[in-house]
Amino acid sequence: MRMWRIESLRVGLIDTRYRLLRVESVSLGSMNESIAHPREIFRPAITYSAYAVIVVHNHPSGDASPSQTDHSLTRRLAEAAELLQIKLLDHIVIGAPSDTSPGYFSFKEAGVL
């Protein structure tokens, strides 16, 4: 995903044993944004009876730092996940690795989730 020229948001569907059931493409955006609504992100989880989800999207710029929009989306996803009783395990932003960055940002690792 880090080499793609447009933002793409995907959701990994996880079963009760924390095994990956499938990966669904939810949104394709422009060069600098991917518009996604929680209902579109959780629709595949409901359809396939997923226990949990991992949300992943890329930043074509290569900078994996989350934007304000990314933070806002993560908060809304956490609220929706709680309401739907589907675990949101992580929201990961993919960029390009560098000397100062591993090339990704994990909201879970950062303590946001």
For each feature predicted by the language model, list its residue ranges.
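Long amphipathic N-terminal alpha/beta scaffold segment
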Residues: M1-L21
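Active-site-proximal loop/helix of nucleotide/amide-processing enzymes and allied scaffolds
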Residues: L13, R17, S27-L113
